[in-house]
Swiss-Prot record:
Protein species of origin: Arabidopsis thaliana
Tissues/organs with expression: Ubiquitous.
Regions of compositional bias (Basic and acidic residues) in chain numbering: 388-404, 412-506
Name of the protein: Peptidyl-prolyl cis-trans isomerase CYP59
CCHC-type zinc-finger residues: 341-357
Length: 506
């Protein structure tokens, strides 16, 4: 009376005590025959104590006996078959994991060490492992969480009955599947934080070159995600355009038109931009050449590398910049967020930042003459005032001319002198205002420049920290993989030695 249990870590052969525990052995054999245990997890592994399985839900709270399937819900559990001569004295003892007195169903456990005598008299012992102690050792050494659930799932793959002394009930034939089920049981509670039983470490599955490539791809993706989060690129998966060349080592005197003329012999050049310092306007000695199609770009790449332009040997490569794509992305995003047009003038062919027009101003110049007051010469008006202002100004001018004609001193020399002095004072005031505006503008530019430099410095520091953290994570991953392989190698060597000793002892 034996059963072969195939697990994800190896095979186990169990000899059953069918003469002393007929109810339990019949229940176990018939559940194996209907493939009830296929896919069941070892949901509880307590090192040097027990390994429990037999629950299709994988929680330790489920499971039914064969008698429930044969006779109904009232027969879900059956009574204990405890014998004093069947003890937990040896490693590999097989017993029922009952929920209490006479509450046996489908769950059972293996003992993982000798002399667990305090379990005697509490659980039904119905078998003993005959072969597969190395598999039992692997189960015992599994890494588990604080609830004794293995981090990597250990499953029963198949069960094969080697000897069955009990006759099959008539209803059993209807319960037997046509083929042995594979995978997870339908009743299993989903748990996404576990490694599946067929998972293998990446360094064991891939070669050294493939593993390095995978790690490099992950690092590149992480960098792209960081750049996306800080706003340097529109999305992590963005790719640079394939029709743009990067040209460096240029002579500072080389102009955009020169590059446009030189590279035009390979195809239509859409743009040739020499990058310049935003303050001084001096060339930074590199440029971007955009072609109309990819073929022209590739031809220029092969022909122009190390070419001589203005006494300089230039270097040509495919552009990795996504600046233009990022600008287009932001422009589309701005249009999408603002109604596909300019909110200033209402036009749909441009956005607000490119608008040079706009609605009629709410502020207009009422009078340039400071003797009438008005501070800066601007007053608040309403919509209707904008169209009435010219007529109002003409009336004011006529009234002023009449007053001057009636005045006895209207054309006097003193009047003219006073007006000249007033004009000189106004011009001096305007020059001071212009200098003040220029000073404020210069200060604002300097402040913006400092802020831009601070942002670039912070971005470089963040990228450096991210790069260092990725390098440390990669080193930790390599170290953990090496440790894991070393532990597995030591464990396999120990299992081999123990198996040889056992065969020698027999």
């Amino acid at each position: 009376m034996s059963v072969l249990i195939v697990t994800s870590l190896g095979d186990i052969v169990i000899d059953l005590h069918s003469d002393k525990c007929p109810l339990t052995c019949k229940n176990f054999l018939k559940l194996c025959k209907i493939k009830y245990y296929n896919g069941c997890l070892f949901h509880t592994v307590q090192k040097d104590f027990t390994a429990q399985t037999g629950d299709p839900t994988g929680t330790g709270a489920g499971g039914d006996s064969i008698y429930k399937f044969l006779y109904g819900e009232q027969a879900r559990f059956y009574k204990d078959e405890i014998h004093l001569d069947l003890k937990h004295s040896k490693t590999g003892t097989v017993a029922m994991a009952s929920g209490g007195e006479n509450l046996n169903a489908s769950q059972f456990y293996f003992t993982l060490r000798d002399d667990l005598d305090y379990l005697d008299g509490k659980h039904t012992v119905f078998g003993q492992i005959a072969e597969g102690f190395d598999t039992l050792t692997r189960i015992n050494e599994a890494y588990v969480d604080p609830k004794n659930r293995p981090y990597k799932n250990i499953r029963i793959k198949h069960t094969h009955i080697l000897d069955d002394p009990f006759d099959d009930p008539p209803q059993l034939a209807e319960m037997m599947p046509d083929a042995s089920p594979e995978g997870k049981p339908k009743e299993e509670v989903k748990d996404d934080v576990r490694l599946e039983d067929d998972w293998v470490p990446m360094d064991e599955e891939l070669g050294a070159q493939e593993l390095e490539e995978v790690i490099r791809e992950k690092a590149a993706h992480s960098s792209a995600v960081v750049l996306e989060s800080i706003g340097d690129i529109p999305e992590a998966e963005v790719k640079p355009p394939d029709n743009v060349l990067f040209v460096c080592k240029l002579n500072p005197v080389t102009e955009d038109e020169d590059l446009h003329t030189i590279f035009s012999r390979f195809g239509t050049v859409v743009s040739a931009d020499v990058i310049r310092d935003f303050k001084t306007g001096d060339s930074l000695c590199y440029a971007f050449i955009e072609f109309e199609n990819k073929e022209s770009c590739e031809q220029a790449y092969f022909k122009m590398d190390n070419a001589l332009i203005d006494d300089r040997r230039i270097h040509v490569d495919f552009s990795q910049s996504v600046s233009k794509l990022w600008s287009q992305f932001r422009q589309k995003d701005s249009q999408k967020g603002k109604g596909n047009g300019c909110f200033k003038c209402g036009s749909t062919d441009h956005i607000a930042k490119d608008c040079v027009g706009g609605p009629s101003s709410k502020f207009i110049v009422k009078d340039q003459n400071r003797q009438h007051g008005g501070g800066e010469g601007y007053e608040m008006v309403f919509e209707g005032d904008v169209h009435e202002t010219p007529k109002h100004n003409s009336h004011e001018r006529e009234r002023s001319e009449k007053i001057q004609r009636r005045s006895p001193h209207g054309n006097g020399e003193g009047k003219r002198q006073h007006r000249d002095e007033r004009d000189d004072g106004r011009r001096q005031h305007d020059r001071e205002d212009a200098r003040e505006l220029e000073r404020k503008h210069r200060e604002r530019k300097e402040r913006e420049s400092r802020e831009d430099e601070d942002r670039r410095r912070r971005r470089r520091r963040e990228e450096s920290r991210d790069k260092e953290s990725r390098r440390e994570r990669d080193e930790d991953d390599h170290r953990s993989h090496r440790d894991y392989k070393e532990r597995r190698r030591e464990r396999d060597d120990r299992h081999g030695r123990e198996a040889r000793h056992e065969r020698r002892d027999r």
